[in-house]
Amino acid sequence: MAGRLLVLSNGHGEDLIALRVLQCLHQRHPELEIAVLPLVGEGSAYAPLEQAGALRRIGPRRSLPSGGFSNQSLRGLLADLWAGVLGLSWRQWRLVRRWGRSGDPVLAVGDLLPLLLAWASGAPYGFIGTPKSDYTWASGPGSAGVAALYHRCKGSEWDPWEWGLMARRRCRLVALRDRFTARGLRRHGVAALAPGNPMMDGLQADPLPAALEHQRRLLLLGGSRMPEALGNLRRLLGALEDWDPQAPLLLLAPCGSRPAPAEWEPLLRGLGFAPERIPDGTGAAAAWRRGPVQLLVGSGRFAAWAGWAELGLAAAGTATEQVAGLGIPALSLPGPGPQFK
């Protein structure tokens, strides 16, 4: 399977999902030349695979004030416009058009923006639709209200202009996150598949160390966008201050490259935590304690630690969905970040 592939993704969660797909694709077809254009942010999630020589990031990239959520608020949109989002999008569009002239395929991961750019390339394209599920309006707390009625009338969380792009002849693949959503799009003439949700791949928990077996275990998810992540973690930890646990409590705080350990220290010291020895077998980068509460911080430890948790306390996006997908209850505390606007 020689050739080239351009991958478009529009957000940190989408980058992680695309990364998981590309890891498997590279294992099966190491001769395939993979180029990645992150439409939102720097695409730092791709760095390990890029360093391994499996792909390369191309094109203009910039971290925007809204974090990719300019459609959630007028303030976010205006901030992105001031930061030059129109010029950035124009340069990205031109790059995709140049790629399309070669006839090499494009894979879009996300929602409307990468799907639209993939269609505009003029080349064959595929689409992995990550953010939308018909379960959000068909049942449960989200099944009432104007938005749910709108989706129910359409018969899909996806909008007509989106499924119109998915139904084009040049669109060779449409993969969605669940069978229920795929079935809704098939009624609109889209050959949608639901082969599985990539965000749930690779979440193989390490064995729980014996030293942690007798502690209650809570997973803290502050998100990956700075500086909101530190503020989110401060709120999550603050929400636990009045709780007097009847048993020793372990807080697991996996993170990415940010916040870095040095960025954690002033936050934790300000909340009365003191550093202590890291328990064996945890893979933590740092350990802190305040009375009966122990907190472990670990970069890149989400996949290993998520399965240890009895409860998730979250202000994150994709990671919150992954925890719920593992069957672990998750409480989401909306914060001031752009994803909650």
Specify the residue positions occupied by each region the protein language model found.
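Nucleotide-activated sugar donor-binding and catalytic core shared by glycosyltransferases
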Residues: 1-341
